Amino acid sequence: MQEHYQPAAIEPAAQKKWDDARISNVSEDASKPKYYCLSMFPYPSGKLHMGHVRNYTIGDVLSRFKLLNGFNVMQPMGWDAFGMPAENAAMKNNVAPAAWTYDNIEYMKTQLKSLGFAIDWEREVATCKPEYYRWEQWLFTKLFEKGIVYRKNGTVNWDPVDQTVLANEQVIDGRGWRSGALIEKREIPMYYFKITDYAEELLNDLDKLEHWPEQVKTMQRNWIGKSRGMTVRFAVSDDSKQGLEGDYAKFLQVYTTRPDTLMGATYVAVAAEHPLATAAAADKPELQAFIAECKAGSVAEADMATMEKKGVPTGRYVVNPLNGDKLEVWIANYVLWGYGDGAVMAVPAHDERDFEFAAKYNLPKKQVIAVGDNAFDANRWQEWYGDKENGVLVNSGDLDGLDFQTAFDAVAAKLQSQGAGEPKTQYRLRDWGISRQRYWGCPIPIVHCEKCGDVPVPADQLPVVLPENVVPDGMGSPLAKMPEFYETSCPCCGGAAKRETDTMDTFMESSWYFFRYMSPKFSDGMVSAESAKYWGAVDQYIGGIEHAILHLLYARFFTKLMRDEGLVNVDEPFERLLTQGMVVCETYYRENDKGGKDWINPADVELTFDDKGRPVSAVLKADGLPVVISGTEKMSKSKNNGVDPQELINAYGADTARLFMMFAAPPEQSLEWSDSGVEGAHRFLRRLWRTVYEYLKQGGAVKAFAGNQDGLSKELKDLRHKLHSTTAKVSDDYGRRQQFNTAIAAVMELLNQYDKTDTGSEQGRAVAQEVLEAAVRLLWPIVPHICETLWSELNGAKLWEAGWPTVDEAALVKSEIEVMVQVNGKLRGKITVAADASKADLEAAALANEGAVKFMEGKPAKKIIVVPGRLVNIVV
């Protein structure tokens, strides 16, 4: 055995050993319990970052722990390869997105392998490959035929200069991120998934997810947003019907969760796209201008919530069905046409947004809810105005005095009898628009025929292959400029037709990839029935909290779609979810001439610390001049505070990187980067190596202790007690608690006790062998390379075949225990007694204790309190 720890030598050797033995390559094996562990797959951006390292190390720790416990473990990896960053890089570097993506995949795969992750690379998928997205297209066509996928007009952000649709995050202050042009809202045909058909099941099945963080489930519940309310129809006033047709000429329909406040409505507001707004604006330039302004704004709901609320009156009126009041119709920029009916009833006295709007435009506020003796002030919003739990109706005629539920039912009865409304359950969740006017995505498998309409591409003509030799220029859709792509014949009539040139939202690929891993080379469907039956759901899923809503919701939705197609036999995709925290690091900057900030990498900064180790000042190493310490933030390119994992691996080895990531913080909390923490992790591994080296140097490996420990010294019994209590704790930390930092700390404590114990005797060496063999197995999930190497020196066998250390229950039973002795509640000494000592024996031993005798000062004991196994308190 080498005297010194040399990760650069042992890590490639250990990895070759695992690869040769194919320990990560699995197939269905009914003789073993299965364990499917999955970390969210990465976007192939070019390099791994520390967030990736943390995410995949957590997954690998759990996978290796289960492997040693006899499970058939699948831990696959792939690439979420479509998306905008590849198009942006392509434009910047004048290279096809495909070439850029495949180069990045190869480099990142090399990085992942260097970290020693037990990944089954034979299951690798890349979502940009036709053999993957073929089956996504196939499912799309099946769902289109069923009506679960449909086409309708949707509102998008349109860049008139680049002639392209922009995502909400690409619109900055109302302008295109690349062109700087003022953005317009446009209506274009788009494809939608009817996720709303599954809203109730998606909501109810959250209750089945016992091993998901409550925070994630709450976020999904809020996103689905089930509410019980009423549809209310306000009759259009006779003098306001001009320009309106059909039902729009008869009534204005709204949805409200507060029908009890209907008597307090003082105006109604409609979206700029509402037919009533269009009709009112026909001869009013000021309305036309406001509608144009609204249409130029963002279509993001989050932006709607924070932007300034604006409106204009239309001069049109509707009639309140309860009291006959005429209410003016306003066009408001906060009402979304794509949500509900594109109209809301406004009750300024009891809704904060309506209150602010009414105050701005001097509209009336009518109180119809009272809470106790609180006085209503029309000039100031108070929280109780919106209280439906404790309020009763006032100023509402025969409804006065009713509470919320009673008033709800009474209003429902009145409106239903008039045909002016009915109760309705509504969801905040909207159907999922998956059309993207981009190049680097999965082609939508639809052919447009003038005679036959929208025709799905038949299964035997799939996949519709995306041309990979395209370099986008950012001007419009490349596919729409390629006749060789879009010119085709109709599958129904054989006539000339045109392919759809939109591509799919990249959330599509990540909504089912976990099923494709089960049979990645299966050529007859999305997943083989045999594989789907064996692997079932993912047992453990790991990823960031930022994916709590969209990705996880769409993955749950797709699972139900695939179940209903008979492809899988589970209702939910992920049994257990771990959302790891971010990796954060200090940030430093200098202000530049333009008033901005030039961010400086922490490696280029030298710090001065106070006597408590806190940084008080910083200078740039290059010039010695000050820089501003800006606090810790998530590692990012924009703040230039990232640490390259490759540099860490090159300097310290993969095991040090893995150990630091698991020891620095519990997995669900943010991890603060620390150079000293990395050095500390490396020191521990050197110490572990040296401990085994020194043990073997004194006489080589022996047979580990097993059997009856009655003949052992107390010191060796205590060491075995520590060993087996540590094994029990670490097993629980890995398996149930998933707290890897405390598992590492427990093994460190075990090695501390080992160092203090005399193991020079024959029995001592056998116990030492037992301790060291167990320690390297307990740490193998976290630092597998060093442990694999040390195991081969200690045992000569293959660690992955050794199994998890078992707990010797006899070793956990201590023949003697240490008990604290107190006098008047203050600790004065300790006594060692038999574990089964009686109360009388404990009292006698405590009274004889030297510290107790001293502090009793010759006084008799008035009372002796015994807490078995813990303490004796003598009261004098």
Swiss-Prot record:
GO terms for molecular function: aminoacyl-tRNA deacylase activity; ATP binding; leucine-tRNA ligase activity. It comes from the Bacteria. The keyword Protein biosynthesis applies. It is found in: Cytoplasm. It catalyses: tRNA(Leu) + L-leucine + ATP = L-leucyl-tRNA(Leu) + AMP + diphosphate. InterPro entries: aa-tRNA-synth_I_CS, aa-tRNA-synth_Ia, Leu-tRNA-ligase, Leu_tRNA-synth_edit, M/V/L/I-tRNA-synth_anticd-bd, Methionyl/Leucyl_tRNA_Synth, Rossmann-like_a/b/a_fold, tRNAsynth_Ia_anticodon-bd. The keyword Protein biosynthesis applies. Keywords: Aminoacyl-tRNA synthetase, ATP-binding, Cytoplasm, Ligase, Nucleotide-binding, Protein biosynthesis. It holds the Pfam family tRNA-synt_1g. HAMAP family: Leu_tRNA_synth_B (MF_00049_B). This is Leucine--tRNA ligase.
